[in-house]
Amino acid sequence: MTTQVPPSALLPLNPEQLARLQAATTDLTPTQLAWVSGYFWGVLNQQPAALAATPAPAAEMPGITIISASQTGNARRVAEALRDDLLTAKLNVKLVNAGDYKFKQIASEKLLIVVTSTQGEGEPPEEAVALHKFLFSKKAPKLENTAFAVFSLGDSSYEFFCQSGKDFDSKLAELGGERLLDRVDADVEYQAAASEWRARVVDALKSRAPVAAPSQSVATGVVNEIHTSPYSKDAPLVASLSVNQKITGRNSEKDVRHIEIDLGDSGLRYQPGDALGVWYQNDPALVKELVELLWLKGDEPVTVEGKTLPLNEALQWHFELTVNTANIVENYATLTRSETLLPLVGDKAKLQHYAATTPIVDMVRFSPAQLDAEALINLLRPLTPRLYSIASSQEEVENEVHVTVGVVRYDVEGRARAGGASSFLADRVEEEGEVRVFIEHNDNFRLPANPETPVIMIGPGTGIAPFRAFMQQRAADEAPGKNWLFFGNPHFTEDFLYQVEWQRYVKEGVLTRIDLAWSRDQKEKVYVQDKLREQGAELWRWINDGAHIYVCGDANRMAKDVEQALLEVIAEFGGMDTEAADEFLSELRVERRYQRDVY
């Protein structure tokens, strides 16, 4: 796009400022330019002089608020795309992350859109927990003047599919809100459903909200944008694996790898707290086994995203083979009329249990059938990348990114099975081999801005990963704030991940305290939550001193047990009852002093 620049004498910018402005906007799309224009208009109108000079609008325009509640970035992408659609339609829209939303203002919302994912056992994303609690509390206001719509993202391989969206949708209606549209529940392959839903939302809102004047069509309150980079989930960087080191002992029941990936001169940047997305390939041996069980050859042509590929290639690169789902089991049973599987159809609990305990290849082995190649790929879900908490800081490792990978290995009736991405990194990528990666930024898991703030890190197992990044960053920054680590695993001698590094940080005074829980080294099992209770008095002192608390690891059990221990510590040493302790912890969450990266 070429813009005719007025003579410099007529501009309020000097040549250097003009050059910087042109350089910054050269590659922007029309939608992005519109957003930038609106952003500067918003900045201008925050100035007192500008406020005084701005005439009052003739009539108040009802604003549209989009709340993004995202765990891995997908919900945020949908929310941002909807925001752009509404701006293009010249509607007044505000996009805000659930974690930044002042939820007590929800009663004043006229048009409210919620885009949410689900984590754990049907729980809302971390950034939406406080909002969810508020809406389900006695403090929630009536919403008779609010019209709303909900788009819910989930994974049908989990029992509580899209539960967070279902919760928000039902509660907003219960509080008196009017549904603009019926809720949409989208599976892993959500893009088509999201595109259709966005179009319907725009049409519905056009009749509700008048078209804005140019100065009103502004995307205000936009936070936690997908960071600008030439590399993304859909356009990953082809990097190289430089280190693959087993960091559990020879006799450990766990196979945990320290993986280092060379980013080269890509310029890819990340921060402690971010995740690394890894696109993996299925094991060729697994592909071969599945193809042969179905009496196929593997060279049959199939269509994937408009391209014709041999079946073997399609299965290796494009379809999920290591995670079964209730839908796949049900569809396979119906398609093959399997006498073993048909009795499960219609029984959600039995389907979920079977899918959780029986990989796709073993389902086919136990209930053999003959499918053509197209029927097979229509049965499967698209392959999706896996996210790993980043275990390094670029202040220390520069053009590298490190992750801590727990390799999933198990047997099904004597046959070795493994996780798709973890075994890809551990077993099938050779040194200097190619790995397609991208950064998934997570602004809801960040070190305190003030380097003097104390930090409490709770990360058993591979949950230790982001805290290695945190400590590298705190050491590089020479941050004077105290640091306290709680770590746990089965055995001290076999499972003390990054032991030498933690001991060095303690010796250097960077790590102020470390408490370790070894669950199998004594008769009575000890976990990190037990250590929290044991150190309750000191923990409360740190919290009173303004400490930020971070939890990383398993969402289903560990995170809940840790939160219960924190509530007990707060109640006992803070002199609160259960309800007050819960409110206190919720306030810490709202203040970003209690952050979790759980999965």
From Swiss-Prot:
<dbReference type="InterPro" id="IPR023173">
    <property type="entry name" value="NADPH_Cyt_P450_Rdtase_alpha"/>
</dbReference>
<keyword id="KW-0813">Transport</keyword>
<feature type="binding site">
    <location>
        <begin position="419"/>
        <end position="422"/>
    </location>
    <ligand>
        <name>FAD</name>
    </ligand>
</feature>
<feature type="binding site">
    <location>
        <begin position="404"/>
        <end position="406"/>
    </location>
    <ligand>
        <name>FAD</name>
    </ligand>
</feature>
<feature type="binding site">
    <location>
        <begin position="525"/>
        <end position="529"/>
    </location>
    <ligand>
        <name>NADP(+)</name>
    </ligand>
</feature>
<keyword id="KW-0274">FAD</keyword>
<dbReference type="InterPro" id="IPR001433">
    <property type="entry name" value="OxRdtase_FAD/NAD-bd"/>
</dbReference>
<dbReference type="InterPro" id="IPR017927">
    <property type="entry name" value="FAD-bd_FR_type"/>
</dbReference>
<comment type="pathway">
    <text>Sulfur metabolism; hydrogen sulfide biosynthesis; hydrogen sulfide from sulfite (NADPH route): step 1/1.</text>
</comment>
<keyword id="KW-0249">Electron transport</keyword>
<feature type="binding site">
    <location>
        <begin position="386"/>
        <end position="389"/>
    </location>
    <ligand>
        <name>FAD</name>
    </ligand>
</feature>
<dbReference type="Pfam" id="PF00258">
    <property type="entry name" value="Flavodoxin_1"/>
</dbReference>
<feature type="domain" description="Flavodoxin-like">
    <location>
        <begin position="64"/>
        <end position="202"/>
    </location>
</feature>
<dbReference type="InterPro" id="IPR017938">
    <property type="entry name" value="Riboflavin_synthase-like_b-brl"/>
</dbReference>
<dbReference type="InterPro" id="IPR003097">
    <property type="entry name" value="CysJ-like_FAD-binding"/>
</dbReference>
<comment type="subunit">
    <text>Alpha(8)-beta(8). The alpha component is a flavoprotein, the beta component is a hemoprotein.</text>
</comment>
<keyword id="KW-0285">Flavoprotein</keyword>
<feature type="domain" description="FAD-binding FR-type">
    <location>
        <begin position="234"/>
        <end position="448"/>
    </location>
</feature>
<feature type="binding site">
    <location>
        <begin position="153"/>
        <end position="162"/>
    </location>
    <ligand>
        <name>FMN</name>
    </ligand>
</feature>
<comment type="function">
    <text>Component of the sulfite reductase complex that catalyzes the 6-electron reduction of sulfite to sulfide. This is one of several activities required for the biosynthesis of L-cysteine from sulfate. The flavoprotein component catalyzes the electron flow from NADPH -&gt; FAD -&gt; FMN to the hemoprotein component.</text>
</comment>
<dbReference type="InterPro" id="IPR001709">
    <property type="entry name" value="Flavoprot_Pyr_Nucl_cyt_Rdtase"/>
</dbReference>
<dbReference type="GO" id="GO:0004783">
    <property type="term" value="F:sulfite reductase (NADPH) activity"/>
</dbReference>
<protein>
    <recommendedName>
        <fullName>Sulfite reductase [NADPH] flavoprotein alpha-component</fullName>
        <ecNumber>1.8.1.2</ecNumber>
    </recommendedName>
</protein>
<feature type="binding site">
    <location>
        <position position="561"/>
    </location>
    <ligand>
        <name>NADP(+)</name>
    </ligand>
</feature>
<keyword id="KW-0560">Oxidoreductase</keyword>
<feature type="binding site">
    <location>
        <begin position="70"/>
        <end position="75"/>
    </location>
    <ligand>
        <name>FMN</name>
    </ligand>
</feature>
<feature type="binding site">
    <location>
        <position position="322"/>
    </location>
    <ligand>
        <name>FAD</name>
    </ligand>
</feature>
<dbReference type="InterPro" id="IPR008254">
    <property type="entry name" value="Flavodoxin/NO_synth"/>
</dbReference>
<dbReference type="Pfam" id="PF00175">
    <property type="entry name" value="NAD_binding_1"/>
</dbReference>
<keyword id="KW-0521">NADP</keyword>
<keyword id="KW-0288">FMN</keyword>
<dbReference type="InterPro" id="IPR001094">
    <property type="entry name" value="Flavdoxin-like"/>
</dbReference>
<dbReference type="GO" id="GO:0050660">
    <property type="term" value="F:flavin adenine dinucleotide binding"/>
</dbReference>
<feature type="binding site">
    <location>
        <position position="599"/>
    </location>
    <ligand>
        <name>FAD</name>
    </ligand>
</feature>
<dbReference type="InterPro" id="IPR029758">
    <property type="entry name" value="CysJ_Proteobact"/>
</dbReference>
<dbReference type="GO" id="GO:0019344">
    <property type="term" value="P:cysteine biosynthetic process"/>
</dbReference>
<comment type="similarity">
    <text>In the N-terminal section; belongs to the flavodoxin family.</text>
</comment>
<dbReference type="GO" id="GO:0000103">
    <property type="term" value="P:sulfate assimilation"/>
</dbReference>
<feature type="binding site">
    <location>
        <position position="356"/>
    </location>
    <ligand>
        <name>FAD</name>
    </ligand>
</feature>
<keyword id="KW-0028">Amino-acid biosynthesis</keyword>
<dbReference type="GO" id="GO:0070814">
    <property type="term" value="P:hydrogen sulfide biosynthetic process"/>
</dbReference>
<dbReference type="GO" id="GO:0010181">
    <property type="term" value="F:FMN binding"/>
</dbReference>
